[in-house]
Amino acid sequence: MKNISTLIKPISSKCNINCKYCFYKDEDKLRKDGCFEKMSLKTLELIVKRVFEVATNQASFVFQGGEPTLMGLSFYQSFISFTKKYNVNNIKTFFSIQTNGILLDKDWCIFLKENNFLVGLSFDGTPEINDINRITYDNKGTSNLVINSIRLLQKYNVDFNILFVVSHDAYNKAKESYKYCKNLGIEYLQIIPVLDPFGNQKESESYSLSKKDLEIFLCDLFDIWYNDFINNKEVRITYFENIITSLINGKGTMCSMNGLCSIETVIEANGNVYPCDFYVSDKYCLGNIYDNNLKELIFSQKAIDFISESINLKNDCTKCKYCNLCIGSCKRYSLNNKNEYKNYYCETYQNFFNYTLDRIIKIAKAYSS
């Protein structure tokens, strides 16, 4: 295999805060064993060994949770030692960690900088929005702690971006959120529509995002971003940049814009491997790294079946004039009824593209020239 990317869950779903919308904690109920115990160094070393057994050009390691910093800094120092031990062919490596930032301190930041980690830091736009859903176990907001972490990352020149979960509480505050993040010195922003609990009816929670909510948010965010873009002052927003890339190259870099799922190689704390962190259930478990190498797991019949499920686009999608920009989006946002597949936010995205397409084309032409 030329390139391989792994998404490692060393602490399973355990976390030091209690976000109301946490989809990964919700997935515990889809596994007989629920939340796994924390990852051992033996399992971590085996993961690294397995990756370098099959990767010939590039290896990416992404750590997520739960909250992965709960493993402690020494765990990641051991990880770096293992990569040096097993990367005998000196292939390219990329390291990333997604965190709420609360445990970050000087030592963490020095380590992350020295080892070229990209940090994904969770923060929902403004303190007021963030502190509605991203709370501690005693119901206190976390924004002050996260902003302190942002300042630390900036002080030590650690590369990072902000992960912004868009909920109902944020739908009419896109411009306010953009300005706040920009004033914080944020350069990269990823927006992620909130997920309803697995198996629940859509819009069943106080934080749930309606179709109109997402439309308002995206259109407002695009307006302020576009005005900054034409003045070369924009915060880079992954979703908008992927739309432009799709127009230019016919394909984005986000898996949700590729038309079908791929195997993300999610590795849980006990060594179980899953195709995607939205599908970490017993039903979708591909096997365990103690029993199989990664090539066997990634090309297993279960993995092929998982990918095949996502190809089942409805005819409405293939007839849509925006199909090349959306391609049905991520199936986790879809409605499934007797194997029928349609993105819940289909009308939302159509209205968004109707509103923005002329400007998107202008940007794409500017990039192309």
Can you name each region flagged by the protein language model?
Residues 1-10, 304-312:
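Ferredoxin-like iron-sulfur electron-transfer modules
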Residues 269:
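Short, ordered coil/turn segments that flank beta-strands lining enzyme active or ligand-binding pockets
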Residues 134-144, 151, 155-256, 260, ...:
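Radical SAM enzyme [4Fe-4S]-AdoMet core and its adjacent flexible, acidic
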Residues 11-18, 67-70, 261, 317-319, ...:
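Cysteine-centered iron-sulfur cluster-binding motifs in ferredoxin-type domains/subunits
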Residues 2-42:
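Canonical Radical SAM [4Fe-4S] cluster-binding loop centered on the CxxxCxxC motif
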Residues 44-62, 71-194, 203:
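Radical SAM/AdoMet-radical enzyme domain recognition
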Residues 280-369:
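Flexible mid-to-C-terminal extensions adjoining Fe-S/redox cofactors in radical SAM and related proteins
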